[in-house]
């Protein structure tokens, strides 16, 4: 059985996972190169029956002259019952390498696993995942995983760096061939064109006949988002909200940009605007043979030197692949950085990428994805999913903030969710701040009524009745979970929550019905549920009630 990966880092990650799941009498073999792979495929040893390798090594078997693989060797391997398990099979299964593997091993069975299969709407080379692997055998969608609490939901935000009204006017004036609104309105023909574009939706879509229609953002050139004004606004938004969003840098984030030059520009902007932020960048280190190659090489050299200086490393451009592994381990808190959270100065706050690390990379310490990049379908869901690994109460969801053509991205998100949730998106996105505060107020009323009905004022003690104690434990857990979510979304004590209506720009203030002091009193009462009686006596075992205890909650600061 061959577990087939399409990248080295995915193979390394998967090898560890497979070895963790293997039985005591099973061995999962790695393949350092094509020679080792061939030897293990030819081997009759029981220890060589489970192999993890890359699609590149497997496709090289037939044509790699160094291996001198003759027809007898291929026949020997083909005489075995071969099963290929292709992980992340939405990625590199539509190219020549997969075809080479299938032609080399025509009797093998191929099973593809992916959370984002390529389908009709986003087909590649007029093919879908079903074209390559056959009809779908089973579906467990991302929405199923979220509802089963195997992964977290998402909290997406579109961030506008330009006013919609300004973009509408700019496009309308350009199409009307007018320099000002006065000029456009003075000419009937120009006025007609001006108002036509002024009334277009921001994002394009399809009309009743299924024909594509453009929106305002379709007319915005890429250069609009490559300039200083946009980039500075993005950097400012990330930095201003960093402490809250990262839980004081406990969690890390990935920032995906649209090109390598932009990744370098953003790196420099972050270094200038926020020298306290531990940031680096990761992209293809191969130097281009065009006019931009020098700029890329200079930028890459600066990034590597900064990384070495901050973390005491000795990487270079030729050893950039090793630096990538170090970055991945640092972000995931894996060997040699298993307990890096105890030494924050060694952590990495923000990783800037173009395409890398947006598929397959797993770290529960990633809680936010920033996007100055357009994504669709499988690429969008895969990138979002870097943020939704389970952690604890500090991480209730994965946050997504997108800045480029935000209205179009909002539509892309809706399309991708429909495609990959089985058209059942319920639970995929978490409640926004206003809904969380409404829930908090409702839960607070329930808790308050519980204490009042028990004859207790000002939450001065826990109820004596065990059923009431259990109900309080359940209510407070829900209360705290919603509060943690609200804090990440911007909730602050003693400050009103301002909700802005996207369509009308109307502002509404929403207030919490409780303050920080009240919360700390409730947290203290909750802790008392699990402490000995004041006289030192133990609780009567017959009075024990099976609480849904969350150990994190019992360590809340009540000072």
Residue ranges and their predicted role:
Residues 1-20, 257-263:
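Conserved Walker A/P-loop ATP-binding site and its immediately adjacent core
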Residues 8-35, 272-276:
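Conserved helix-turn-beta segment of the N-terminal RecA-like "Helicase ATP-binding" lobe
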Residues 12, 210, 242-246, 258-287, ...:
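Catalytic cores and motor modules of nucleic-acid processing enzymes
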Residues 20-66:
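Inter-Walker segment of RecA-like/P-loop motor cores
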Residues 49, 201-353, 511-514, 518-533, ...:
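Conserved C-terminal RecA-like helicase domain
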Residues 50-86, 91-100, 334, 353-355:
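Conserved RecA-like ASCE ATPase "motif II neighborhood" in helicase/translocase motors
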Residues 123-250, 267-272:
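Interdomain helical connector at the RecA1-RecA2 junction of SF1/SF2 helicase-like NTPases
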Residues 386-418:
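Conserved segment of the helicase C-terminal RecA-like domain
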């Amino acid at each position: 059985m061959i577990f087939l990966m399409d990248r080295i880092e995915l193979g390394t990650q998967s090898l560890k996972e497979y070895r963790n799941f293997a039985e005591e009498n099973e061995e999962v073999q790695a393949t350092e190169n094509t020679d080792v792979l061939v030897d293990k495929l030819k081997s009759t040893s029981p220890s060589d029956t489970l192999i993890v390798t890359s699609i590149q090594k497997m496709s090289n078997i037939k044509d790699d002259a160094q291996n001198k693989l003759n027809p007898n060797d291929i026949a020997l391997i083909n005489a075995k019952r071969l099963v290929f398990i292709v992980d992340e099979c939405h990625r590199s299964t539509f190219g020549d390498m997969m075809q080479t593997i299938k032609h080399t091993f025509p009797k093998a069975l191929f099973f593809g696993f992916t959370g984002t299969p390529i389908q009709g709407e986003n087909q590649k080379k007029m093919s879908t995942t079903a074209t390559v692997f056959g009809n779908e055998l089973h579906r467990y969608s991302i929405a199923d995983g979220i509802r089963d609490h195997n992964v977290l939901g998402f909290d997406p935000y579109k961030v506008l760096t330009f006013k919609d009204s300004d973009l509408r006017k700019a496009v309308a004036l350009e199409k009307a061939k007018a320099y000002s609104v006065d000029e456009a309105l003075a000419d009937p023909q120009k006025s007609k064109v001006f108002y036509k574009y002024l009334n277009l939706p921001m994002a394009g879509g399809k009309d009743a006949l299924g024909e594509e229609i453009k929106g305002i953002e379709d007319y915005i050139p890429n250069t609009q988002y490559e300039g200083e004004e946009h980039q500075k606004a993005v950097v400012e938004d990330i930095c201003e909200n960093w402490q809250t969003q990262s839980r004081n840098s406990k969690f890390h984030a990935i920032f995906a940009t649209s090109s390598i030059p932009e990744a370098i520009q953003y790196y420099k902007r972050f270094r200038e605007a926020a020298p306290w932020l531990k940031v680096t960048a990761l992209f293809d280190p191969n130097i281009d043979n065009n006019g931009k190659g020098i700029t890329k090489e200079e930028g890459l050299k600066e990034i590597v030197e900064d990384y070495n200086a901050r973390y005491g490393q000795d990487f270079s451009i030729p050893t950039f692949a090793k630096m990538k592994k170090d970055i991945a381990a640092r972000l995931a808190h894996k060997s040699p950085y298993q307990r890096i959270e105890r030494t924050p100065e060694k952590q990495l706050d923000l990783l800037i990428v173009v395409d890398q690390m947006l598929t397959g990379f797993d770290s529960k310490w990633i809680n936010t994805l920033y996007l100055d990049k357009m994504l669709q379908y499988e690429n969008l869901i895969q990138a979002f999913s870097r943020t939704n690994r389970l952690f604890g109460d500090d991480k209730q969801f994965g946050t997504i903030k997108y800045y480029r053509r935000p209205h179009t991205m909002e539509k892309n998100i809706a399309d991708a969710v429909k495609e990959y949730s089985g058209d059942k998106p319920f639970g995929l996105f978490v409640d926004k701040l206003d809904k969380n505060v409404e829930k908090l107020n409702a839960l607070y009323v329930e808790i308050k009524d519980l204490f009042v009905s028990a004859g207790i004022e000002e939450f001065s003690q826990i109820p004596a009745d065990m059923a009431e104690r259990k109900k309080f434990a359940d209510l407070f857990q829900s209360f705290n979970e919603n509060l943690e979510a609200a804090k990440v979304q911007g909730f602050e004590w003693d400050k009103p929550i301002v909700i802005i209506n996207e369509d009308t720009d109307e502002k509404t203030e929403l207030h919490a019905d409780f303050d920080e002091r009240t919360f700390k009193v409730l947290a203290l009462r909750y802790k008392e549920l699990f402490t000995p009686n004041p006289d030192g006596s133990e609780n009567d075992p017959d009075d024990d009630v099976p609480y849904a205890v969350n150990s994190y909650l019992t360590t809340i600061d009540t000072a």
